[in-house]
């Protein structure tokens, strides 16, 4: 069954997470229409190869055109309009950046797969009964639903009682006026007063009953408001706070955030009940004006009840105004909350009170550092202006689910220049990537005679002026959201708190799992812990300072732990993503562990790991071999960097890697990928197939061109491989050699097969720094 069809069969709680994956960057509507085709493409490979990404992107546009033609024949105007709009958007955003849409789609597909796995695991283990956390959450939500239903029922019951009281009051008013009129006539005629006294007693009984019902209604209203206050506190202080914390976690690569639809339904339901209750309290005022008496409970309690319901509704509306999508540059979707000056960023706000009458009524204004002007000057932070479309009206049409929201797509920041280069105080203690800024959203609500000022803030953002500041800026975002749920602590880095290894390890794994299909294993994390904290047995609970994580150089290195790791993450995403997703790259492994696992393997077994000495990120392979005396040798090649991987894929490097011995014989030392996977099975599918066409002859030459092939070679003048140089040296324009170094025989077509070796380094022998 297709993945998309499987997703449609999941429970609501999983479907809510699915909705959260999609946005305007890659509409769910397109995912639905092109599901089979989308799932048949290798988006992960396209995300790492621009040429393939371009091909897939143009094929995507072609698929959209086919769907458009189908809807044109069916005269489906709505889908025609939507597809035309989607295609125009994709062309405007991704035509020059096809790898970006490939990365987005690849991540969505992977998150979908992870969602299916989570659901399957829950089903296999007996559902939520075997998952205490999930069960507690579900039980809490069920209790909340029951409380909301109870509130709605009590509101309706009160509505009926109000009608009974109103009818009783009308009867009392009629009888009272009738008796008064008859009494006046009797006074004029001097008639007997006994009938009048009897009717007066009846009126007194009616008034007593009316008073009892009024007191009952006032008491029930007070109890209802207390129930509303409890439900509201649960919604805002627990459910909404939990969602905001999950949003923080999702921003730094954690599990996808659960969408807001269910929370919106709860809050809207409560808001509707509150407005209905407010109308009931206003009705009490009308009843009071009709009939009032000494000790009237309405006179005593109505003002307080009205004050309470208005305050509850105001607070609910203020809490319901949230940032649904945190500020993010479209070019860096996996690193929200980092904004570069002069570069557009997007963000989205939402009101979780879904009142149709508020559609197109709320104008949102955006500003930055609204409440921190004096603080910014005091601590020397830069100041910025927001440019672009910084006002927008909330509406229900732009969102897929009809929520009341406003998405800002064309915002940019410009620094206010001061005399000292933009810093308000040249003695500022924080570097620019530790400065935190708040983006504020404001609006006013006018509803049923109430004016409510709404304001919400983004999570703190880091503003950079150069993309080279991105790694340190992202480190700040990670550290902040890992250690605090305070949404407005812009002075966080004046005294950054200490994290534990358990917290750091989880976040580090997210940096891989959020952009690839694989997080970090316990063994890989242990290796990273050793680099951060030194040798140890149990790192759980060990403390890590902000400086240790990001600012101080590692022992014996000229760069920090985070700079090194971030460059490896970049290397994985751009150059070796497919191999990482397959689990072929062991990555982080100590040299002792490396030697231990390879020494028991047959010669030619290799593993792939990251360089520990390359600041810019490097990947290498280590293999085992036997010397002429049968002694096991472990060899490593000098790490390949991004610059080298730009010219040749790592899979092709491994498949073609040779050693040239003193007799000029080419030998391939790599046979298996650890533990025992033939290298052809592991890497062959990631190599470009060799062209079967014969090259054309130069018009000025009688003979055809000879084929060329780039491979990496390590030359050695040694008689055996005991002293094999560790660095990859390559030879240029070596002709006449076949796979085993023997003279190539002419082919049937009279051509010679030839190998051209890319010569980048000239030293014949070198010792690896690894």
Swiss-Prot record:
One of its GO terms (molecular function) is DNA-binding transcription factor activity, RNA polymerase II-specific. GO terms for cellular component: cytoplasm; nucleus; plasma membrane; RNA polymerase II transcription regulator complex. The modification Phosphoserine is found at residue 727. Gene3D superfamilies: EF-hand, SH2 domain, STAT transcription factor, all-alpha domain, STAT transcription factor, DNA-binding domain, STAT transcription factor, N-terminal domain. A motif (Essential for nuclear import) lies at residues 150-162. It holds the Pfam family STAT_alpha. Residues 580-670 form the SH2 domain. InterPro entries: p53-like_TF_DNA-bd_sf (IPR008967), SH2 (IPR000980), SH2_dom_sf (IPR036860), STAT (IPR001217), STAT3_SH2 (IPR035855), STAT_linker (IPR048988), STAT_N_sf (IPR036535), STAT_TF_alpha (IPR013800). One of its GO terms (biological process) is positive regulation of Notch signaling pathway. The modification N6-acetyllysine is found at residues 49, 87, 601, 615, 631, 685, 707. The modification Phosphothreonine is found at residue 714. It is found in: Cytoplasm; Nucleus. The modification Allysine is found at residues 601, 615, 631, 685. The modification Phosphotyrosine is found at residues 640, 705. Involved in the gp130-mediated signaling pathway. Signal transducer and transcription activator that mediates cellular responses to interleukins, KITLG/SCF, LEP and other growth factors. Once activated, recruits coactivators, such as NCOA1 or MED1, to the promoter region of the target gene. May mediate cellular responses to activated FGFR1, FGFR2, FGFR3 and FGFR4. Upon activation of IL6ST/gp130 signaling by interleukin-6 (IL6), binds to the IL6-responsive elements identified in the promoters of various acute-phase protein genes. Activated by IL31 through IL31RA. Forms a homodimer or a heterodimer with a related family member (at least STAT1). Component of a promoter-binding complex composed of STAT3, NFATC3 and NFATC4; complex formation is enhanced by calcineurin. Interacts with IL31RA, NCOA1, PELP1, SIPAR, SOCS7, STATIP1 and TMF1. Interacts with IL23R in presence of IL23. Interacts (via SH2 domain) with NLK. Interacts with ARL2BP; the interaction is enhanced by LIF and JAK1 expression. Interacts with KPNA4 and KPNA5; KPNA4 may be the primary mediator of nuclear import. Belongs to the transcription factor STAT family. This is Signal transducer and activator of transcription 3. It comes from Bos taurus (Bovine). The lineage of its organism: Eukaryota, Metazoa, Chordata, Craniata, Vertebrata. The gene is STAT3.
């Amino acid at each position: 069954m297709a993945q998309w069809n499987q997703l449609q069969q999941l429970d609501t709680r999983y479907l809510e997470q699915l909705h959260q994956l999609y946005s305007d960057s890659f509409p769910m509507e397109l995912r639905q229409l092109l599901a089979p085709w989308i799932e048949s493409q290798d988006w992960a490979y396209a995300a790492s190869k621009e040429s393939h990404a371009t091909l897939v992107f143009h094929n995507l546009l072609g698929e959209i055109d086919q769907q458009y033609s189908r809807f044109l024949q069916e005269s489906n105007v709505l889908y025609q309009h939507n597809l035309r709009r989607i295609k125009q958007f994709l062309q405007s955003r991704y035509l020059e950046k096809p790898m970006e849409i490939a990365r987005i789609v690849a991540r969505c597909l992977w998150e979908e797969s992870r969602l299916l796995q989570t659901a399957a695991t829950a089903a296999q283990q007996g559902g939520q009964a075997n998952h205490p956390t999930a069960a507690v959450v579900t039980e809490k939500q069920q209790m909340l639903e029951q409380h909301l239903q109870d509130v709605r029922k009590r509101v309706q019951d009160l509505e009926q009682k109000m009608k009974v009281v109103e009818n009783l009051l009308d009867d009392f008013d009629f009888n009272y006026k009738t008796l008064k009129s008859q009494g006046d006539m009797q006074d004029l005629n001097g008639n007997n007063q006994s009938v009048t006294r009897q009717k007066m007693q009846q009126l007194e009984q009616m008034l007593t009953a009316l008073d009892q019902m009024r007191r009952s209604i006032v008491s029930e209203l007070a109890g209802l408001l207390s129930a509303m206050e409890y439900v509201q506190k649960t919604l805002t202080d627990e459910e909404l706070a939990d969602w905001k914390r999950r949003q923080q976690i999702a921003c730094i690569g954690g599990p996808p955030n659960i969408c807001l639809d269910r929370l919106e339904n709860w809050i809207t339901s409560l808001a509707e009940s509150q407005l209905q209750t407010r109308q009931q309290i206003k009705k009490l005022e009308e009843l009071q004006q009709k009939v009032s008496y000494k000790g009237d409970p309405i006179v005593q309690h109505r003002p307080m009840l009205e004050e309470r319901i208005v305050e509850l509704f105001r607070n609910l509306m203020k809490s319901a105004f949230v940032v649904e999508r945190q500020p993010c540059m479209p070019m860096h979707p996996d690193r929200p909350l980092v904004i570069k000056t002069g570069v557009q960023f997007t963000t989205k706000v939402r009101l979780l009170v879904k009142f149709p009458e508020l559609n197109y009524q709320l104008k949102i204004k955006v500003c930055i550092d609204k409440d921190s002007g004096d603080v910014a000057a005091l601590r020397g932070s830069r100041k910025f202006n927001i440019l672009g479309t910084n006002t927008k009206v909330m509406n229900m049409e732009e969102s897929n689910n009809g929520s009341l929201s406003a998405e800002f797509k064309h915002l940019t920041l410009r620094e206010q220049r001061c005399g000292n280069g933009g810093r308000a105080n040249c003695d500022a203690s924080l570097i620019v990537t530790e400065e935190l800024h708040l983006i504020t959203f404001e609006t006013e609500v006018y509803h049923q005679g109430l004016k409510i000022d709404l304001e919400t803030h983004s999570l703190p953002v880091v503003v950079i002026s150069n993309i080279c500041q991105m790694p340190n800026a992202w480190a700040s975002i990670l550290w902040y959201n890992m250690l605090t749920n305070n949404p407005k602590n812009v002075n966080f880095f004046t005294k950054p708190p200490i994290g534990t290894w358990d917290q750091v390890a989880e976040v580090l794994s997210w940096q891989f799992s959020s952009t690839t299909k694989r997080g970090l294993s316990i063994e890989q994390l242990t290796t990273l812990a050793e680099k951060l904290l030194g040798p140890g047995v149990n790192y759980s609970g060990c403390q890590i300072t902000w400086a240790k994580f990001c600012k101080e150089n590692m022992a014996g290195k000229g760069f920090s732990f985070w700079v090194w790791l971030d460059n490896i993450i970049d290397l994985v995403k751009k150059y070796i993503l497919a191999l990482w997703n397959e689990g072929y790259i062991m990555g982080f492994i100590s040299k002792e562990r490396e030697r231990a696992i390879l020494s028991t393997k047959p010669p030619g077994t290799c593993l792939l790991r990251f360089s520990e000495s390359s600041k810019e990120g490097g990947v290498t392979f280590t293999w085992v071999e036997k010397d002429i005396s049968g002694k096991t040798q472990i060899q490593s090649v000098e790490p390949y960097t991004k610059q080298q991987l730009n010219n040749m894929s790592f899979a092709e490097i491994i498949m073609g890697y040779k050693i040239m011995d003193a007799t000029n014989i080419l030998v391939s030392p790599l046979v298996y990928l650890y533990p025992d996977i033939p290298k052809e099975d592991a890497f062959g599918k990631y190599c470009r197939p060799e062209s079967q066409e014969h090259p054309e002859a130069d018009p000025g030459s009688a003979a055809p061109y000879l084929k060329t092939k780039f491979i990496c070679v390590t030359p050695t003048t040694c008689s055996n491989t005991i002293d094999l140089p560790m660095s990859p040296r390559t030879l240029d324009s070596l002709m006449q050699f076949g796979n085993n170094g023997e003279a190539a025989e002419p082919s049937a077509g009279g051509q010679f097969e030839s190998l051209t070796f890319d010569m980048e380094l000239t030293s014949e022998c070198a010792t690896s720094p690894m």
